[in-house]
């Protein structure tokens, strides 16, 4: 029969082995956070943010300037104006505007994000919100760069679309309407990738053909890709399919093709 001391030694040994095994378990990048010290607001992971957005459990606030938000933002995120009188180098959103957004409910859950680990905008806004007695503020400090890197699609607003088409000659616009509609007229030099030809899976259907014939920018996967469809749902479906093909700067337009066309008329 084992002595009490021997049993204790065995249990202790198993505990140590278990602890070592636990510490050696590979991490999941989707549950990772930056883990900075000295911050008064907690972080959320990419997985947590996806759940928050899916279940509408918090106000997700893009802490960047409006044009940057309009060009590319996490779907479902909101944006408010800058605090007046602040230089761009120290940009911070206006707490008063946040108050109007949440209708004065300072206990409402808020998640902030900006341009990733080295961006200070969400940290500055978090501090100002805490100083104004907000009690439920967290940050997705990994920000939009990591969101994209992990296969997250983004949205582009109408004013962002105008800006990109006027200023970014490298951007690729994808029109996902069916052939008859596309050939009847499209936006400038938009390329055709019909929604009906985009299949589940990787390297299949029309997406594979678009890779091979040059419609998709295979020699620079960082190229800005904007997807526009007959409906927002069609555009988002194709945009999400493209992110699964390792294109990580993909945005879909938040309106219809007709809305984009009307707004872009001279």
Regions inferred by a protein language model and the residue ranges of each:
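Structural scaffold elements adjacent to functional motifs in cytosolic proteins
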Residues: 60-62, 173-175
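Rhodanese-like catalytic fold shared by cysteine-dependent sulfurtransferases
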Residues: 2-47, 55, 69-112, 116-172, ...
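Primarily extracytoplasmic ectodomains and periplasmic/lumenal surface modules that are beta-strand-rich
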Residues: 59, 67-68
């Amino acid at each position: 029969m084992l002595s009490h001391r021997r049993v204790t030694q065995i249990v202790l040994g198993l505990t140590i082995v278990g602890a070592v095994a636990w510490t050696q378990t590979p991490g999941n990048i989707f549950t990772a956070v930056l883990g900075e010290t000295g911050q008064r607001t907690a972080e959320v992971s990419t997985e947590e943010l996806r759940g928050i957005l899916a279940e509408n459990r918090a106000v997700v606030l893009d802490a960047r300037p409006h044009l940057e938000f309009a060009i590319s933002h996490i779907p479902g995120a909101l944006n408010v104006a800058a605090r007046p009188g602040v230089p761009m180098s120290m940009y911070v959103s206006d707490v008063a505007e946040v108050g109007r957004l949440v209708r004065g409910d300072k206990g409402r859950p808020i998640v902030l994000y900006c341009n990733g680990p080295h961006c200070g905008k969400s940290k500055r806004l978090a501090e100002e919100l805490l100083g104004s007695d907000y009690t439920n503020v967290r940050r997705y400090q990994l920000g939009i760069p990591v969101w994209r890197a992990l296969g997250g699609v983004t949205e582009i607003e109408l004013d962002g679309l105008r800006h990109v088409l006027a200023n970014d000659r490298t951007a690729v616009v994808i029109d996902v309407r069916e052939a008859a509609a596309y050939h009847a007229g499209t936006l400038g030099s938009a390329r055709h990738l019909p929604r009906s030809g985009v299949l589940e899976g990787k390297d299949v259907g029309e997406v594979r053909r678009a890779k091979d014939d040059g419609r998709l920018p295979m020699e620079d996967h960082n190229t800005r890709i904007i997807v526009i469809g007959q409906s927002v749902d069609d555009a988002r479906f194709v945009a999400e399919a493209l992110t699964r093909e390792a294109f990580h700067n993909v945005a879909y337009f938040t309106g219809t093709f007709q809305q984009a066309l009307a707004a872009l008329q001279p």
